[in-house]
């Protein structure tokens, strides 16, 4: 009986190990894409307000693709705190496969899940509840201009 118990334990252990190894594979999105991907794509956007322009390259993740599907947008950009500007979107974006990320830095374009808004960072930040959508291409100096302005976001 103890031999059978050992055999069952090994079988259960092996099955558990195989299942644990398969979990990261099932967490991947359709077509083998990693939903939390931080790799840039060829999708670029332009953000224009107050006669200033920023460009950003979007990452290959479901949330960034959902944002791109909404473009062009004419909304409002405003200051929030001392490190970002925000843009309220017309609807929430998909959060499919999102997860935490590290190496936060100024120049990140993110989506804030609780409020459903874009967060454009020009200073250091660390906050849970964000999905990184991409990075600004050539700096973020226009974000330093304080105030609230009409903003146009479009694909380029």
Language-model segments: residues:
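Second-shell loop/turn segments in exported
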Residues: 51-57
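Short, Lys/Arg- and Gly-enriched loop/turn segments at beta-strand edges
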Residues: 117-123
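Well-ordered alpha/beta subsegment
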Residues: 135-156
């Amino acid at each position: 009986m103890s031999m059978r118990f050992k055999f069952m334990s090994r079988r259960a252990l092996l099955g558990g190990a195989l299942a644990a190894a398969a979990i990261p594979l099932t967490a991947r999105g359709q077509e083998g894409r990693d939903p939390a991907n931080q790799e840039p794509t060829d999708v670029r956007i332009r953000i224009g307000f107050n006669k200033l322009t920023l460009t950003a390259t979007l990452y290959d993740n479901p949330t960034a693709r959902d944002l791109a599907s909404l473009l062009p947008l004419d909304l409002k950009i405003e200051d929030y705190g001392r490190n970002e500007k925000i843009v309220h979107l017309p609807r929430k974006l998909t959060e499919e496969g999102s997860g935490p990320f590290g190496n936060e830095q100024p120049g990140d374009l993110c989506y804030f899940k609780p409020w459903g808004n874009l967060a454009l960072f020009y200073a250091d930040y660390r906050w849970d509840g964000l999905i990184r959508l991409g990075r600004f291409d050539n700096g973020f100096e226009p974000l330093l201009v304080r105030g609230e302005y009409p903003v146009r976001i479009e694909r380029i």
